[in-house]
């Protein structure tokens, strides 16, 4: 076999764009100073072998079993995945350091309903450290095999020997292929290692979960092609000093990307939170100025969240604007609506907006709730008692209709709320709701109902 030739190539660390020379600005993603030099080996002859080919088949000839999904034993994870794990799927689990990625994957090994063996490969921890975590989480299954290895070729030999049904790799940034001369974690290694894992998943029907690091900006570390190659991208998020964790699907070929799973970090590991609304509102004081409850939709699940606003006179020439959990640009737009349409001199005030519990909400249905919290804080007047607020606000101050109103109100009724201020366009003649509903057409009407006691 002819020996491969080495050549120097420059890769963009953000998107994986390849160039023969160094470039200041990447033509692929537009980022500056992201190119690094790597040595790659160009294979010749039949060295670059492809995956085994298959014969073309018609749709009628392809066998498909809808109940083929594997129950992970973790209800919140099943929800995010779309009903369970699909055999042969390659999944990427990313999140900040210390957020609980390794804890979640280790708990999965003890709860999953699977007869096949499970191979847990770690390139970051020793066998003793992994056993300590397993004992702390109460995991003692005989199906679980632990391997500490960074060489993907060695890992392949153990897969051929053990023949597992599930492979967990922690993490993709620490493994390497020996035929690639660049260091582990480089663009070339990440791309080639992911390609190898994809070959195993599709060729062997092996479910693969890969743990990935994130950058300081919160994006998945490595080239963008990494996210394109996998079937599912899961993101585990939460505040470092907050014990709640949110699992989201940023990409899912086998289900929705709008669902979330809620967990609580405890000494014994991650505990599922089946009723997030109760958790997020558990410490909410009654009749508090600047606080409002909004029923949000996370996929098909209604979740009640508390919005808190603090409006104070600014001692500086340039007022401060800070948001946590809500979209900054949308909040700025709503402030402009208040200034223009309601004649409120809010522009010279410091504005602080927070979604309690570390949840990130980006749907327009919280617009009216944001406005209500801001005006309540500015005028030092509490919101209407036992009320929830929802509605999208337009640039002219009108309150627009929203989706899934009945689901949101049913959740509000479960949590003891008795009144809902909603868009008038959502109300139909003769329609019944579980709680009292007040329809409003614009921001002025909504504020009179919420702050005037009407």
What role is predicted for each listed range?
Residues 3-14, 18-79, 86-92, 99-110, ...:
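Peripheral, non-AAA+ core regions of ATP-driven protein-machinery
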Residues 96, 123:
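P-loop (Walker A) phosphate-binding loop of NTP-binding proteins
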Residues 118-122:
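Conserved RecA-like ASCE P-loop NTPase motor core of nucleic-acid helicases/translocases
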Residues 127:
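Divalent metal-dependent catalytic cores for phosphoryl transfer on phosphate-bearing substrates
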Residues 147:
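Conserved SAM-binding strand-loop segment of SAM-dependent methyltransferases
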């Amino acid at each position: 076999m002819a020996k491969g030739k080495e050549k120097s190539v420059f890769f963009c660390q953000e998107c994986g764009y390849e160039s023969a020379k160094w470039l200041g600005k990447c033509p692929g993603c537009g980022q500056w100073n992201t190119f690094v030099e790597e040595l790659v080996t160009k294979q010749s002859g039949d060295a670059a072998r492809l995956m085994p080919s298959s014969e073309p088949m018609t749709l009628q000839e392809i066998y498909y079993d809808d109940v083929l999904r594997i129950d992970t034993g973790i209800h919140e994870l099943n929800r995010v995945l779309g009903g369970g794990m699909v055999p042969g799927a390659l999944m990427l689990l990313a999140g900040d350091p210390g957020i609980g990625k390794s804890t979640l994957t280790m708990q999965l090994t003890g709860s999953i309903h699977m007869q096949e063996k499970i191979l847990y490969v770690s390139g970051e921890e020793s066998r003793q450290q992994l056993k300590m975590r397993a004992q702390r989480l109460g995991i003692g299954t005989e199906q679980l095999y632990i391997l500490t290895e960074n060489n993907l070729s060695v890992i392949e030999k153990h897969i051929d020997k053990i023949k597992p049904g599930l492979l967990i790799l922690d993490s993709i940034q620490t493994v390497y292929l020996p035929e690639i001369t660049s260091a582990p974690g480089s663009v070339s290694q990440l791309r080639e290692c992911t390609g190898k894992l994809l070959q195993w998943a599709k060729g062997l029907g092996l479910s693969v979960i890969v743990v990935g690091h994130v950058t300081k900006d919160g994006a998945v570390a490595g080239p963008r092609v990494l996210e394109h190659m996998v079937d599912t991208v899961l993101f585990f998020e939460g505040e470092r000093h907050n014990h709640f964790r949110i699992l989201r699907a940023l990409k899912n070929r086998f289900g929705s990307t709008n669902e979330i799973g809620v967990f609580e970090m405890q000494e014994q590991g991650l505990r599922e939170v089946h009723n997030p609304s109760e958790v997020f509102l558990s410490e909410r004081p009654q009749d508090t100025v600047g606080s409002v409850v909004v029923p949000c939709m996370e996929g098909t699940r209604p979740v009640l969240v508390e919005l808190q606003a603090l409006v104070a006179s600014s001692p500086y020439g340039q007022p401060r604007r800070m948001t946590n959990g809500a979209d900054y640009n949308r909040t700025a737009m709503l402030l402009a609506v208040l200034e223009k349409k309601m004649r409120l001199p809010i522009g010279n005030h410091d504005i602080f907006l927070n979604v309690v519990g570390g949840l990130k909400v980006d749907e327009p249905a919280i617009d009216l709730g944001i406005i209500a919290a801001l005006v309540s804080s500015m005028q030092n007047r509490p919101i209407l008692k036992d009320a929830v607020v929802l509605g999208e606000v337009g640039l002219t101050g009108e309150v627009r209709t929203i989706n899934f109103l009945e689901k949101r109100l049913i959740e509000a009724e479960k949590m003891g709320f008795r009144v809902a201020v909603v868009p008038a366009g959502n109300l139909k003649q003769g329609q019944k709701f579980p709680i009292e509903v007040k329809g409003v057409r614009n921001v002025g009407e909504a504020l009179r109902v919420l702050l005037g006691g009407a």
